[in-house]
Design a protein with these regions (language model features):
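Phosphate/dinucleotide-binding and metal-coordinating scaffold of catalytic cores
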Residues: 1-186, 190-192, 203-350, 355-359
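Canonical protein kinase catalytic loop motif
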Residues: 197
């Protein structure tokens, strides 16, 4: 691409993206946001096409494209649909990741969880997921990692409660962030997602009104034993709240859900069969593997239902009202056990449709 440094990339692209409302320009430039932003103006798609294919190119690309500033490890590109909607197209490493995103959308729809709606498509003879831009032209996406780095850490709190506290200090209503956190904790366990890190659960802020809300659930591709040999329900190391632990922690992290009464777990009836159908669409997942995944999901559903029943009215959880003296607001947050306080004290935050559509 002929880019020698990050500074050169910034100068050529103006730092424009589809994830925030910020950009740079020379002081003498007469460029205006209204004429250059990617939310309302057309952009070059050649760079994105090349990034999403397996073919190399010596072409000198225009950086008037959001692809130059899009993060993440998987190949992806932006395009503009006929109605003007910005669409993110994302591939995977194994071919299963795009299907997993669709399955996660189905699951969230069943449970009434706000989530990005993914669809399945085909690009360059490979399965891809597609989803619409989640922001308006006055909003920015702020990652949990950025938010946690912006506040002083309170080591009296567990990792989960430090996140809740930081989100509240950033301006998000306490109940909203607690509910959103519960949502992805539940979905991640049911899907066996192994890659929920501090850069893929976020808040959305309106830069004009400064109102803050949780981002809808997204990025659940690393799920359903994708790329793994063994398919079983052994406990495993879970991100993000126990990422530094050496022992399996997924079941422990599931127990951080604060309010099970929000979920109608009866809506999970038949979900494993739907998953099997979705996985069979591309022909990339063997039938024996699909059967094994469906069997494990049935067991996970039973486990989640059992935990929800035993949680009852959450009477075993000690809570504390954190008021102005703590700088946290007045939300009710679970108070960590003494053991958890010790264990988390040295934590260092880490960044760490029914048929295909062709593009």
């Amino acid at each position: 691409m002929g880019i020698r440094s990050a500074v050169e990339l910034l100068n050529r692209s103006h730092g424009l993206s589809l994830s925030d409302q910020y950009w740079v320009k020379p002081e003498s430039s007469d460029l205006e946001w209204d004429t250059v932003n990617f939310f309302t103006n057309p952009f070059d798609e050649e760079l994105g096409r090349t990034l999403l294919t397996a073919r190399s190119s010596s072409h000198r690309f225009s950086l008037n494209a959001p692809d130059a500033s899009t993060g993440g490890d998987l190949p992806k590109r932006w395009t503009i649909a006929g109605d003007g909607t910005r669409i993110l197209i994302k591939a995977g490493r194994t071919g299963q990741e795009p299907v997993n995103e669709l399955i996660a959308s189905d699951l969230c729809s069943r449970l009434g969880i706000p989530a990005v709606r993914y669809n399945l498509g085909e690009y360059d003879n490979r399965p891809v997921s597609t989803c619409p831009e989640m922001l308006t032209d006055t909003e920015e996406l702020v990652s949990a990692w950025q938010i946690l780095e912006s506040v002083k850490r309170d080591n009296r709190l567990s990792a989960r409660d430090q996140w809740i506290r930081a989100a509240q200090l950033f301006g998000c209503e306490g109940a909203a962030v607690v509910h959103a956190t519960d949502d992805w904790l539940l979905v991640d366990y049911l899907m066996r997602n192994i890659d929920r890190h501090y850069n893929n659960f976020d808040l959305i802020r309106d830069v004009e009104t400064l109102r803050v809300r949780p981002a809808p659930l997204f990025d659940t591709g690393a799920s359903l034993w994708c790329g793994e040999l063994a398919i079983d329900n052994r406990d495993y190391k879970a991100k993000p709240f126990y990422a530094t632990y050496k022992t399996p922690t997924a079941r422990r992290q599931l127990r951080l859900i604060s309010d099970w009464t929000r979920y109608d777990l009866g809506k999970l009836d038949g979900w494993e069969e739907q998953v099997g159908h979705r996985l069979s669409v591309t022909g990339l997942v063997p039938e024996t593997r699909i059967t094994a995944i469906a069997t494990m999901l049935s067991a996970r559903i039973r486990e989640v239902r059992s935990l929800a029943e035993s949680a009852g009215d959450d009477s075993n959880h000690k809570t504390v009202v954190m008021g102005a003296e703590t700088g946290i607001g007045t939300g009710m947050l679970p108070w960590p056990s003494p053991m958890e306080q010790v264990e988390m004290g040295n934590l260092h935050w880490q960044s760490t449709t029914s048929g295909p559509t062709s593009f």
